[in-house]
Amino acid sequence: MGLISYENEAINEVKKADNHHVSKFVTSYYGPSSSSWQSGIWILFVLFVAAVILIILFTFVANRRRRRMGRAPIRGTAWLTPPSYRQSQQQYTGTVQQRTDDYVPEYTETANEHDLGYYDQRGEFHPNDKAAYVAPPPLVQECSSESVNSLERPPAAVVHQANSLDTDYGLTRPSNGRVPAVSDTVEQLERLPGGTTTQEINPPERAKVNARS
């Protein structure tokens, strides 16, 4: 109170000394209609609006996240959540008062017209006589008539030789019961039935001379 009274006394003294010529300037500077006071009010208003917008955005994001998790929105903020399909459709068409038909078929004790049947309490399936029979698709034949009447020759069949068990990759098996061993000598190999002969192996130098000749 002392500071305010001191300012008022100073203003009155200035008015008396200056013959009330500066009264308008002093009143505009110290009065409630000054430019600094108005700018402060606008700054507070802008900060308040920004805080409200941030709170609304945060609530919208939180409700959207809770809806994805299957939880209810925050109490009192359900109007911030996006509308459901049926709700948005009613708002678009303007048929809020008119009751729309449910997309889910009505549950009855017996099978509906388009149901194939139903299961009883014991788990046995009972077909519905009212359901229309749908024929299965026709079977696809492996060999059509076009391939039979075509002029293309089929691939040759693979025929195995009668003695395929005795020959394998050009290797012959001896007809006798005894198989030559590595430790057998030349004389023992010659005594074996079948006339087993030995093959002469030429050294590398002699093989080169034979190849040139």
From Swiss-Prot:
PANTHER family for the chain: PROTEIN RCR1-RELATED
Protein name: Protein RCR1
Membrane topology, record value: Single-pass type I membrane protein
A GO term from the CC aspect: intracellular membrane-bounded organelle
Compartments, record wording: Endoplasmic reticulum membrane
Lineage, broadest ranks: Eukaryota, Fungi, Dikarya, Ascomycota, Saccharomycotina
Gene: RCR1
A Pfam short name: RCR
PY motif (motif): residue ranges: 104-107
InterPro entries tied to this protein: Chitin_synth_reg_RCR
